[in-house]
Swiss-Prot record:
MF-aspect GO terms: aspartoacylase activity; hydrolase activity, acting on ester bonds; metal ion binding
Positions of the catalytic residues: 178
Catalytic activity line of the entry: an N-acyl-L-aspartate + H2O = a carboxylate + L-aspartate
The name this protein goes by in its record: Aspartoacylase
GO cellular component, one term: cytosol
Listed InterPro entries: AspA/AstE_fam, Aspartoacylase, AstE_AspA_cat, Aste_AspA_hybrid_dom
Subunit structure of this chain's protein: Homodimer.
Cofactor (UniProt): Zn(2+)
Similarity comment: Belongs to the AspA/AstE family. Aspartoacylase subfamily.
NCBIfam families xrefs: PRK02259.1
UniProt cofactor note: Binds 1 zinc ion per subunit.
Chief location of this protein within or outside the cell: cytoplasm
Length: 313
């Protein structure tokens, strides 16, 4: 009996981005290594290109020079007339777009893995932008299964107003890889090993797929963003409370109505309101202070993928 599956085109071109944020050093370190010796990321019949996305920020070990490269891959910025007056990252975004995009172009990259670190206690995290992408749900299922018993979480940023224009979004299949906790400007061996394994399993999945392996229907648990929460602020806009100790480092754990969220300097606890349990992520992320984000609320749900198989086999 012939199984019912979705026939997908073979994957031909993959890019691995490091240094989208220049002080998130695991991706920088790995990509620089793979540029020197890329044997471990090569797979038969697959073009895999490691790439430093924001070299100036990497050189200065800072998140960005003029603006956040991972927020400006929208039509407005990509369509601006190139000039020296443009912010460095906008010019760089246009260069990257022409090298790796456009999303549905004939020569565009099939998959871009964008490597990030977080100061939050998020462990191994895969970031998904489209809940209907059978191929990526299958890939994430494979990565999660391969990493077990090490947990690997899936963060779904599909949202009408909270989704942002990522560097990787120019690929047909964009994949964010976020591993922490790791301070900015620091390398940790355990975090590096985890990210390296995530890339290995992802490339193995692509190789098996291209070789004709059929992946049966699967389901994965994901955490979908529903709201970003700012710190409490005083009348001057200054932060008036910090993340409560009970919430610190509790990414992915349930936060119930009435549970402590923030703590003021005079000892007052500010609890979660409403009547819904949420799952916080990016708790107390250092890079998000400037974005006025103390953490993001997510809701937990299941995503299903149909069986897939490469169309050339």
């Amino acid at each position: 009996m012939t199984s019912c599956h979705i026939a997908e085109e073979p994957i031909k071109k993959v890019a691995i981005f490091g240094g989208t944020h220049g002080n998130e050093l695991t991706g920088v370190f790995l990509v620089k290594h793979w540029l020197e010796n890329g044997a471990e990321i090569q797979r038969t019949g697959l073009e895999v290109k490691p790439f430093i996305t924001n070299p100036r920020a990497v050189k200065k070990c800072t998140r960005y020079i003029d603006c956040d490269l991972n927020r400006i891959f929208d039509l407005e910025n990509l369509g601006k007339k190139m000039s020296e007056d443009l912010p460095y990252e906008v010019r760089r975004a246009q260069e990257i777009y022409h090298l790796f995009g456009p999303k549905d172009g004939e020569d565009s990259y099939d998959i871009i893995f964008d490597l990030h670190n977080t100061t939050s206690n998020m462990g191994c995290t895969l970031i998904l932008e489209d809940s209907r992408n059978n191929f990526l749900i299958q890939m994430f299922h494979y990565i999660k299964t391969s990493l077990a018993p090490l947990p690997c979480y899936v963060y779904l940023i599909e949202h009408p107003s909270l989704k942002y224009a990522t560097t990787r979004s120019i690929a047909k299949c964009p994949v964010g890889i976020e591993v922490g906790p790791q301070p900015q400007g620091v390398l940790r061996a355990d975090i590096l090993d985890q990210m390296r394994k995530m890339i290995k399993h992802a490339l193995d999945f692509i190789h098996h797929f291209n070789e004709g392996k059929e992946f049966p229907p699967c389901a994965i648990e994901v955490y979908k963003i529903i709201e970003k929460v700012d710190y409490p602020r005083d009348e001057n806009g200054e932060i008036a409370a910090v993340i409560h100790p009970n919430l610190q480092d509790q990414d992915w754990k349930p936060l119930h109505p009435g549970d402590p969220m923030f703590l003021t300097l005079d000892g007052k606890t500010m609890p979660l309101g409403g009547d819904c349990t949420v799952y916080p992520v990016f708790v107390n992320e250092a890079a998000y202070y400037e974005k006025k984000e103390a953490f993001a609320k997510t809701t937990k749900l299941m995503l299903n993928a149909k069986s897939i198989r490469c169309s050339v086999h």
